[in-house]
């Protein structure tokens, strides 16, 4: 039996690592899952891995923005004397495999695409090599990026994609997150994405491994079995579907699939439960969403609005008209379904008029929590390829940057991000806190309706309205400032004044949100809200758990 250490973010149960862990267990290998959620975890994670002395260290490199952290971890392992095999995996590692193999000799290999079978084969080969004392013939393993004797990258053929019906279910060690005593756990009912958005690496990743067939689904009976098992063995009542596409193309097919899943769950005698899903605006259909809420008990649906500007929809290749965004929000409002969304306010082609269009959308959907930011250039995406072809990128494969389409748009972006950074991206970002507050409310309303007052639900919506409209006011102020060609000498005073106003609004909302959380906790009388009552809060399923997740 070999020991394998798996390193990655465990802010919630990391399904990619946990599927690999269960596949390794099925092959007779032991694993330790070592959380590396933030910079402060680095020393603990490093000492933990060194103490384990594993034959293989697998590092999850799914998020490009954290690539430096995880590559530094590999370097630190070597500096501290670790001589075993270090492999990387994930979206970014797959796309940047040749560059990483070239630039980081500390990395032994990269597992490309879906890696369950690749990691098992790699571990088996390392174990065999340890027994015989001969080098492992790794070039025979599909799905690896290796290094030739002269240092050049060598990519073995693409791996065979695992059969979702035969994969061992993900390792569920450790305590789950909980909200008012109701366990929360992520799962997937499918893999892949049938869309082709220009800014997203997910579709490109699956297209690379399975051209033209990049979306696979599990049978509903298999999904229902997993849900019931988790409820019975771990106390899971809230199931968060992390599918890139929980919805399949076609409203009729979605209605049939969701109805079949509800039937399967009822047949198995599942207790009271709730679901959380993600949807595209084009997925939002009255009949489908009625089943989603009434029979699958959906308490939160993230809707991928992304932008309401026609130009943005074209640049991002969303292939849905802006009117569909409003229809989606109107239906969520009619069903009283908690919805949240993000807006990619800045993209390579954004104009001031596009900004104003999206500001109007924030006001239109003000009671639904939202956030905004810039489109980033991720490895493997069509948008990155386009920007490189146009000569508009700077940086390197670790982090590409670009300028917006005009100096005035660059100015709007710079001023906005300076003023809004704390609200949108800070450690205590209120835009995320509000999403968590609404999640707590919906959990309470669904599982404890007898104690939840209607005015608490309205208070949650009102806090979102205040924040959304305040943000819209702030963005409009930035646009006005830029439109009048205000001199640069006025920028600091303007941003400081705007930021001060934003912080004052945030303080008022934060106080009311804490009071609301206390009311919920006291009324329910068991467990805690998912968002902490204090300065450090978490978005749904983004609560860092300082739990050592070892076998």
Report residues per predicted region.
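N-terminal [4Fe-4S]-dependent radical SAM core
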Residues: 141, 146-190, 507, 546-549
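Radical SAM enzyme core and accessory elements
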Residues: 2-7, 42, 46-55, 106, ...
């Amino acid at each position: 039996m070999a020991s394998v250490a798996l390193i990655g973010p465990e802010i919630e149960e990391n399904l990619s690592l946990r599927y690999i862990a269960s596949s390794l267990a099925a092959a007779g290998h032991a694993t330790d899952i070592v959380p590396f959620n933030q910079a402060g975890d680095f020393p603990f994670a490093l000492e933990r891995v060194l103490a384990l002395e594993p034959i293989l260290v697998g590092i999850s490199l799914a998020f490009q923005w954290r690539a430096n952290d995880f590559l530094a971890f590999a370097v630190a392992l070597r500096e501290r004397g670790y001589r075993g095999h270090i492999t990387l995996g994930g979206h970014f590692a797959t796309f940047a495999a040749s560059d990483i193999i070239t630039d980081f000799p500390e990395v032994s290999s990269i597992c490309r695409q879906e890696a369950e079978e690749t990691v098992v084969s790699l571990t088996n080969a390392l174990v065999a090599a340890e027994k015989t004392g001969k080098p492992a013939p790794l070039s025979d393993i599909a799905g690896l990026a290796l290094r030739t004797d002269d240092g050049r990258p060598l990519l073995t053929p693409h791996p065979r994609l695992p059969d979702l019906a035969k994969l061992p279910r993900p390792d569920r060690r450790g305590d789950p997150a909980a909200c008012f005593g109701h366990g929360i756990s992520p799962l997937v009912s499918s893999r892949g994405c049938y869309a082709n958005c220009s800014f997203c690496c997910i579709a490109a990743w699956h297209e690379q491994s399975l051209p033209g067939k990049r979306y696979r689904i599990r049978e509903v009976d298999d999904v229902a079995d997993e849900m019931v098992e988790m409820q019975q063995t771990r106390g899971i009542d809230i199931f968060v579907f992390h599918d890139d596409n929980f919805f399949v193309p076609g409203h009729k097919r979605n209605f049939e699939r969701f109805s079949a899943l509800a039937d399967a769950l009822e047949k198995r005698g599942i207790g009271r439960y709730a679901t959380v899903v993600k949807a595209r605006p084009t997925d939002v259909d009255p009949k489908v969403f009625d089943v989603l809420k009434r029979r699958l008990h959906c308490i939160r649906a993230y809707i991928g609005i992304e932008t309401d500007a026609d130009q943005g929809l074209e640049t991002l290749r969303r292939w849905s008209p802006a009117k569909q965004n409003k229809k989606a929000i109107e239906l969520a409002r009619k069903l009283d379904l908690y919805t949240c969304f993000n807006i990619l306010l800045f993209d390579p082609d954004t104009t001031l008029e596009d900004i104003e269009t999206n500001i109007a959308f924030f006001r239109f959907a003000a009671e639904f929590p939202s956030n905004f930011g810039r489109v980033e250039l991720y490895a493997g995406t069509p948008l990155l390829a386009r920007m490189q072809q146009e000569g508009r990128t700077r940086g390197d494969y670790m982090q590409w940057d670009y300028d917006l389409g005009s100096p005035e748009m660059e100015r709007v972006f710079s001023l906005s991000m300076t003023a809004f950074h704390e609200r949108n991206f800070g450690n205590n970002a209120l835009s995320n806190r509000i999403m968590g507050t609404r999640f707590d409310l919906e959990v309470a309303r669904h599982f404890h309706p007898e104690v939840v007052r209607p005015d608490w639900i309205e208070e949650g919506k009102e806090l979102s309205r205040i924040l959304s409209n305040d943000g819209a006011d702030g963005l409009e102020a930035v646009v006005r400032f830029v439109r009048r060609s205000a001199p640069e000498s006025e920028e600091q005073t303007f941003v400081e004044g705007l930021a001060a106003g934003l912080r004052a609004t945030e303080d008022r909302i934060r106080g009311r949100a804490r009071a609301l959380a206390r009311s919920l906790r006291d009324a329910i009388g068991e467990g805690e809200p998912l968002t902490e009552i204090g300065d450090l809060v978490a978005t749904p399923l983004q609560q860092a758990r300082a739990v050592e997740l070892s076998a």
